[in-house]
């Protein structure tokens, strides 16, 4: 993502944003909230004198509109962001319109920006200069490859070995050759992780096949394979070492600490009412909010209050397991400095 930030007056103002990939659209999905004013060039039907006689001949032309946002949808597989709202600037003021944003579009967003918003923009800018990180998880007879997106790991390939109906290769040799062949196509940083010694065999073959590879290769020891191994790797801080991105690791470690404290009956709050009480007492050390609540006025107000008290604020991705677990606790929780019971 590229961004041009005008001087903000008391955190309010205009920021021009230039999304470059699906990760950037995901960031925009969390930055554009109801009530924001978004300017973008879009296609809209323009009526002429002939159009009134033959409305089916209405022509769509590019126009620049300002939309007062009502809702936003992120479509991961079509790589598109849909912004719904009412036109406040441009043609047909007062009419409803949907902006269909894709990588390469330029938009301007006018709103009150929170500290977590500006942190997200900074993260997106830094992420645009980094190559994609892949994590290969390997255990006996099973391999899965994940691409690390801003909103969590996405499985892009898998392979099973054995004699069952779901097996794709039958021998250990075929399995390791197929895995090495697949990951040898990658050019960016690679993490190979899993329990036991199977990964060691894969790593040795990979290095023999790619002796001149310059991108980082990191080994991760985990207790499990598959998606659980990916979460372990992220929690170990390996992504931070590869590209400096702390966010996903923060989500893992904060959720782990929350569950540990709940299990030991140590100071925490979860659910909107309990967190509101803790915030009012100034007891919040770390506020955790799942991104689906960013459009909720009560949650947004608690974020602003927490930032004003210099509490840490961590926004969780609803598409990553820690965020899914946080959603099960009401979508918002806090680690407290002291008990308020």
Curated annotation (Swiss-Prot):
Principal subcellular localization: cytoplasm
Enzyme class: hydrolase
Stored Pfam families: eRF1_1, eRF1_3
Keywords noted in UniProt: Cytoplasm, Endonuclease, Hydrolase, Metal-binding, Nuclease
Listed GO biological process terms: nonfunctional rRNA decay; nuclear-transcribed mRNA catabolic process, no-go decay; nuclear-transcribed mRNA catabolic process, non-stop decay; ribosome disassembly; RNA surveillance
Entry domain remark: The N-terminal domain has the RNA-binding Sm fold. It harbors the endoribonuclease activity.
Record organism: Methanospirillum hungatei JF-1 (strain ATCC 27890 / DSM 864 / NBRC 100397 / JF-1)
InterPro entries (UniProt xref): eFR1_2_sf, eRF1_1_Pelota, eRF1_3, Pelota/DOM34_N, Pelota_arc, Ribosomal_eL30-like_sf, Transl-rel_pelota
UniProt KW Hydrolase keyword: yes
Source taxonomy: Archaea, Methanobacteriati, Methanobacteriota, Stenosarchaea group, Methanomicrobia
Gene for this chain: pelA
Domain of life: Archaea
Purpose of the protein: May function in recognizing stalled ribosomes, interact with stem-loop structures in stalled mRNA molecules, and effect endonucleolytic cleavage of the mRNA. May play a role in the release non-functional ribosomes and degradation of damaged mRNAs. Has endoribonuclease activity.
Compartments reported by the entry: Cytoplasm
EC number: 3.1.-.-
Protein name, entry field: Protein pelota homolog
